[in-house]
Curated annotation (Swiss-Prot):
Gene, per the UniProt record: snrnp27
One GO BP annotation of this record: mRNA processing
Biological role: May play a role in mRNA splicing.
Disulfide bridge map: none
GO cellular component: precatalytic spliceosome
Protein name: U4/U6.U5 small nuclear ribonucleoprotein 27 kDa protein
Signal sequence region: none
Biased composition (Basic residues): 13-59
Length: 158
């Protein structure tokens, strides 16, 4: 009756050939770009490095504000160390009286004379210490009078 709407076998073959050639070209181009850059895995889980040591990132340039802060710190440090050094020497001269040679050696090695506590005393480094560590009693959840409440340990409630 009527003509079939499908193309003739010859044309179909030609078209398939041209399509495959363009696909082949595209595939080759993709392979070249893949070889240039590292091929990415398809997994979405975070990449794990083989070494467990932390990576160190160093920025080559320092922002002007950081540079200014660093200069300020450098100016402050020498003054503090000069004042602190003479104080330590004075204390060391007073502490040497009535000490044995072993105690004097310990002072030189460790930098402090005795194991005396500094609790409640004002020290140079404690100027910034404003946070208070309050230890509270532990609170536990009640499991009695509950379904499945027995034979299980008490949970700590933070």
């Amino acid at each position: 009756m009527g003509r079939s709407r499908s193309r003739s076998p010859e044309r179909r073959r030609e078209r398939r050939r041209s399509r495959s050639a363009s696909r082949e070209r595209e595939r080759r181009r993709r392979e070249r770009s893949r070889s240039r850059e590292r091929r990415r895995s398809r997994s979405r889980s975070p990449h794990r490095r083989r070494s467990r040591s932390p990576r160190r990132h160093r920025s080559s340039s320092i922002s002007p504000s950081r540079l200014k802060d660093r200069r300020d710190d450098d100016k402050k440090e020498p003054k503090e160390s000069k004042g602190g050094g003479s104080k330590e020497r004075q204390l060391a001269a007073e502490d040497l009286e009535g000490k044995t040679e072993e105690e004097i050696e310990m002072m030189k090695l460790m930098g402090f004379a005795s194991f005396d506590s500094s609790k409640g005393k004002k020290t140079d480094g404690s100027v910034n210490a404003y946070a208070i560590n309050v230890s509270q009693k532990r609170k536990y959840r009640q499991y009695m009078n509950r379904k499945g409440g027995f034979n299980r340990p008490l949970d700590f409630v933070a």
